[in-house]
Amino acid sequence: MGMKRNRPRRGSLAFSPRKRAKRPVPKIRSWPERETVKLLAFPVYKAGTTHALYKENNPKSPNADQDVFTPVTVMEAPDITIAGIRAYGKDTKGLKALTEVWADSFDKELGRKINLPKEPKANTEKLDEVADKIVEVRAIVHTNPKDTNLPKKKPEIIEIKIGGKNISDIIAYAKDIIGKKLSINDVFTGGEFIDTVAITKGKGFQGPVKRWGIKIQFGKHQNKGVGRHTGSIGPWTPKRIMWTVPMAGQVGFHQRTEYNKRILKIGENGSEIVPKGGFLNYGVVKNNYVLVKGSVQGPAKRMVVLREAIRNPEDKFGLPELTYVSTESKQGN
């Protein structure tokens, strides 16, 4: 980076305020445009990391047709349940919910999260009544953590946009999937580029050196035991502290999006990917799983939403050939 004359901080102000997320489930605020009628995202649970070798199928790479080492993240992908459909219109203030339809029946675990109707009825005709006003249709889905090794039964509920150009086709697809279970193979394929949206690991209350990367002061400051503080918090005038001054505070547990992660494999037999002794702080994988190249934000057990790539790269290379996936113990023995 080189030497800078003034370096008040290393961190970016673009991420301010650096406060805790409201809940450990991410909220997706923007969606890509797709012509295919299908869900544009899928929630999974992060299990852990390992490493793998794959044959590079990018012809532009200097390692083309060679075995390449890479760290990979393993995420368990149990089937999701389509609990309802919500239709949105548009006014001068933006999107506005027009109507919603709930399924005929629900999993009993969903009652741990919301109040279920006593006599559910999927009245899908409500979608046809406002079809001329609909600009976007989203599926109300919930996860099924009871099918995994997680010590929880309460599901997470999120909205996922249904892609497509023709509203009538989107409504027909929504009517078809309501009340059903979908697998990750209904949404993604191997070799595809995706975005990962999740809440990062929480670090708690930290000082300005760790939080903003300010310089540690030596000499008389360190002798007085104040070497890790902000040297100046502002001028005499204006007589207030600017919000840009690097201060101690919350680190981690923020919602972050990482773009263009590559799916190396989507598997059905989780036992083939579990290392000896299981994944640390997670255990074994019992359902479908996704192998993503590189790291993914968040600790083990946290829900990660895989979204269709919103900055979709022009070059697509298809599914690479995996030659080796490590299943050695991650417990250090």
From Swiss-Prot:
- Note the Gene3D superfamilies from the entry: 3.30.1430.10, Ribosomal protein L3, domain 3 (4.10.960.10), Translation factors (2.40.30.10)
Q: What GO CC terms are in its UniProt record?
A: cytosolic large ribosomal subunit
Keywords, comma-separated and alphabetical: Ribonucleoprotein, Ribosomal protein, RNA-binding, rRNA-binding
Entry's PROSITE patterns? RIBOSOMAL_L3
Q: Which GO terms describe its biological process?
A: translation
Keyword Ribonucleoprotein present in the record's keywords: the answer is yes
Q: Where is this region: Disordered?
A: 1-29
Q: Which Pfam families has this protein been placed in? A: Ribosomal_L3
Q: Which family does the UniProt entry place this protein in?
A: Belongs to the universal ribosomal protein uL3 family.
- Relate the protein's function as given in its record: One of the primary rRNA binding proteins, it binds directly near the 3'-end of the 23S rRNA, where it nucleates assembly of the 50S subunit.
Q: What is this protein called?
A: Large ribosomal subunit protein uL3
Q: Which gene encodes it?
A: rpl3
